């Protein structure tokens, strides 16, 4: 049994059709070279580990509650809940569902494949052998600091993003110049 993996830079496109065409061409060439061998399949993986996107935030305690002291208590609970979601897959499922609500809305609004993105992110949450929460929360000084890293293969050109009027409008509202590559 042999698996051959390719890494294709599709730039700002999602590139599924292009990648599958490349893989089919490679499979045909392999069939020519090794006619006695069976090729089970030649298809892309939606587990986009080479397309990681990160977001971070800093929230002052006073923004979390009626005052700084209550905000600090809330920050500590958020941090503890995030740590617990790393240990317990039942908590992680609900923790990540909340994250996915926002991600899937943006993915759908821009005409991207919500199922592909969702599958990739959930696989990433289980990459260490246990399904875990996707966020990291820490207390730094008088702030709650959060970080999220997920595989996010989405398109800003091609496919539905350029055909569907609502997807085009959604992309126009985003300031894509803020993206750091």
Predicted regions and their residues:
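Short, well-ordered amphipathic alpha-helical segments that serve as non-catalytic structural scaffolds
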Residues: 25-27, 170-173
